[in-house]
């Protein structure tokens, strides 16, 4: 589902992704506050699908903001093999691992994944887990609640 919001003009490029972290104190008096913040869910990763040309003033972004259309971003994570079934809806939980230097750590503990998501596809790449866990790399899409 597409949503309308505002984003810094320098960041407003089709295809860019961002994780919405919530409003800042400086946003309180702004007349665009509702457009910027009311359509987005904190902690969700979004992808910009279109950018409008008009530029609007903003006290946070030096070069102003642009109106953009966004959708929840599809992205890749790693989960336990037994949970990796295409089309299934799951509630996210990180893989239990504390090896922060592991090449897979960021995919096992992804930022911007919260709540429920749908397994869009199971990727064919083999995941090598140093702890011996049976893992799969998958592509996911957040489920709108």
Curated annotation (Swiss-Prot):
Top-rank taxon: Archaea
InterPro entries in the cross-refs: UPF0179
Pfam families: UPF0179
Family recorded in the similarity comment: Belongs to the UPF0179 family.
Protein name stated in the entry: UPF0179 protein MMP1679
Species assigned in the record: Methanococcus maripaludis (strain DSM 14266 / JCM 13030 / NBRC 101832 / S2 / LL)
């Amino acid at each position: 589902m597409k949503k309308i919001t505002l984003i810094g003009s320098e960041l407003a490029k089709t295809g860019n992704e961002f994780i919405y972290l919530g409003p800042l104190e400086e946003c309180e008096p702004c007349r665009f506050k509702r457009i910027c913040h009311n359509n987005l869910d904190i902690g969700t990763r979004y992808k910009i699908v279109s950018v409008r040309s008009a530029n609007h003033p903003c006290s946070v972004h030096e070069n102003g903001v642009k109106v953009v259309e966004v959708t929840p971003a599809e992205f890749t994570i790693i989960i336990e093999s037994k949970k990796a079934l295409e089309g299934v809806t799951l509630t996210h939980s990180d893989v239990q691992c504390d090896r922060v230097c592991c090449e897979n750590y960021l995919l096992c503990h992804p930022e911007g994944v919260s709540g429920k998501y749908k397994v869009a596809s199971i990727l064919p790449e083999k995941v090598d887990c140093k702890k011996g866990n049976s893992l799969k790399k998958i592509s996911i899409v957040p489920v709108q609640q």
